[in-house]
Every structure is written in structure tokens, then in C-alpha cells.
UniProtKB/Swiss-Prot annotation:
Protein name: Thiosulfate sulfurtransferase RDL2, mitochondrial
Active-site positions on this chain: C106
Entry keyword annotation includes Oxidoreductase: no
Domain Rhodanese per the UniProt entry, residue ranges: 45-146
Domain of life: Eukaryota
Keyword Magnesium appears in the UniProt entry: no
Catalysed reaction, written as an equation: thiosulfate + hydrogen cyanide = thiocyanate + sulfite + 2 H(+)
GO cellular component: mitochondrion
Keywords: Mitochondrion, Transferase, Transit peptide
Disruption-associated phenotype: Increases frequency of mitochondrial genome loss.
Biological process (GO), any one: sulfur compound metabolic process
Role of this protein: Thiosulfate sulfurtransferase which catalyzes the transfer of sulfane sulfur from thiosulfate to cyanide.
MF-aspect GO terms: thiosulfate-cyanide sulfurtransferase activity
Organism: Saccharomyces cerevisiae (strain ATCC 204508 / S288c) (Baker's yeast)
Length: 149
């Protein structure tokens, strides 16, 4: 199979000749979040949106962004596909419900995009990405941002 910008381009070989079939699909693009939008979510947590840090636990130990949950994409890529009880057993918190918007971040934005794509494959349709991630967050003074009561 060959990946194509508008869908999946697959090749079917028959006795006569190869045939190319273009299958298209549409999905809602993830929302892209800026530093200011994420800062607002940290300062004013929203029960309809959830910040998901997909870095590895050892990275999160160095700096944990306020109000985030940690679901590491490299060591647990299938986490969002787990049954709720198993997810809770592994992560010690409830599996995010499908009706929440999951906003993914990592160190520099690359793993966040991967995690967002995986989340979609597990039925999470309302997703976002903070491409600046922790690198931008810290560079712009995010370490001083705290939830307001």
C-alpha cells in the first residue's frame, strides 16, 4: 500500500494487469493550539478538554506541566485502546472519555502528532495538538503558570 495525501492508494494485481484503486476518506483535522491557548487551559481548567503529555515518565519527572495527564506514546502506544478497568490498573487514573477533547503535547511536538493519530484510531474524534509542546512552554515562561482558583 502506498500512502497518498487524499487517502490510501492500493495496488491490486490481477492476471491481466495491475489496477490502482484510490480510496478516499475524510476526517476532521485536529485543532492546533498556541502557547496562549494552552496557558489559558492550564490557568482555567476545562472539564471538556484534557491536556495529555505523551512523553515518557522519566521525562515527565524532569518537568510536569500543571493539569496534564501522562500517557506515554512510545512505551504504551495502545493505551487508549485498553478497556477502562485495565487502563486504570496501568495508569492509576480513569481512561479519558471519548466526549472530551484530548490535546496532545510532548517535548517538541513530534510524538504529540503520533499520539493524536493513534487516539483517532481508537475512536477519539475530538483531538488537538500543541506543536510547541514543552520546549515552547518553558521558553515562553510556562513554568510559572499555575491553575487559578
Amino acid at each position: 500500500m502506498f500512502k497518498h495525501s487524499t487517502g490510501i492508494l492500493s495496488r491490486t494485481v490481477s492476471a491481466r494487469s495491475p489496477t490502482l484503486v484510490l480510496r478516499t476518506f475524510t476526517t476532521k483535522a485536529p485543532k492546533i493550539y498556541t502557547f496562549d491557548q494552552v496557558r489559558n487551559l492550564v490557568e482555567h481548567p476545562n472539564d471538556k478538554k484534557l491536556l495529555v503529555d505523551v512523553r515518557e515518565p522519566k521525562e515527565v519527572k524532569d518537568y510536569k506541566m500543571p493539569t496534564t495527564i501522562n500517557i506515554p506514546v512510545n512505551s504504551a502506544p495502545g493505551a487508549l485502546g485498553l478497556p477502562e478497568k485495565e487502563f486504570h490498573k496501568v495508569f492509576q487514573f480513569a481512561k479519558p472519555p471519548h466526549d472530551k477533547e484530548l490535546i496532545f503535547l510532548c517535548a517538541k511536538g513530534v510524538r504529540a502528532k503520533t499520539a493524536e493519530e493513534l487516539a483517532r484510531s481508537y475512536g477519539y474524534e475530538n483531538t488537538g495538538i500543541y506543536p510547541g509542546s514543552i520546549t515552547e512552554w518553558l521558553a515562553k515562561g510556562g513554568a510559572d503558570v499555575k491553575p487559578k482558583k
